[in-house]
UniProtKB/Swiss-Prot annotation:
GO terms for cellular component: cytosolic small ribosomal subunit. GO terms for biological process: translation. The gene is rpsB. Belongs to the universal ribosomal protein uS2 family. The keyword Transmembrane helix does not apply. GO terms for molecular function: structural constituent of ribosome. This is Small ribosomal subunit protein uS2. The keyword Ribosomal protein applies. InterPro entries: Ribosomal_uS2, Ribosomal_uS2_bac/mit/plastid, Ribosomal_uS2_CS, Ribosomal_uS2_flav_dom_sf. Keywords: Ribonucleoprotein, Ribosomal protein. It comes from the Bacteria.
Amino acid sequence: MTTVSMRDMLQAGVHFGHQTRYWNPKMKPFIFGARNGVHIINLEHTVPMFNEALAFISNVASKKGKVLFVGTKRAASEAIKEAAVSCDQYYVDHRWLGGMLTNWKTVRQSIKRLKDLESQSVDGTFDKLTKKEALMRTRELDKLEKSLGGIKNMAGLPDVIFVIGADHEHIAIKEANNLGIPVVAVVDTNSSPDGINYIIPGNDDAMRSIRLYTQSVAAAAKAGRGQDLAVQAEQDGFVEAE
């Protein structure tokens, strides 16, 4: 099972929160103290809470569940995409479009348009258009790919969303809450933990911290998917040779 240790977190700087003047009092239970005007997060809480979240994600993946990685701020977007792709899951790394979950029917139409344009770009359709029309469609394709590329093969709502930066992604969290989709989120000392099923109190700005979260969640999803494949193989009558 994927787990993260106190040492891993210390090395990644997970314990460094925001400046004390920007704190959210709702995070008080997870704060150890302050040093040089910066809140220090109590990793005695974060370690078990993160490992519980990883076990939950692994369990979701073991049942063929869909995990949606969400991180649209600059520090998180690249790591979010890499991690989701590495474990065959889904991601939003550019901008959260309002209604992405709650208005899925409309989003699905946009995904259909994206896939149509992708087909046109490779089957020669663009070559038959005027330069202006081809350019317009290329721009539309790029725009849709940026917004929806990470969910174009999701085929329905996710079973859990994993969020880096609860304050930045509050719209995504609210939509998931409205639909009863569980939320796993990294919550820094300046954010509210409300509406989050699995709170991970930790630094949501440092690249090393973000990579620790995203890579661990990807590993948990892979491990869960491996369990699912092992069960499937057993059901299909495949047994590994000694």
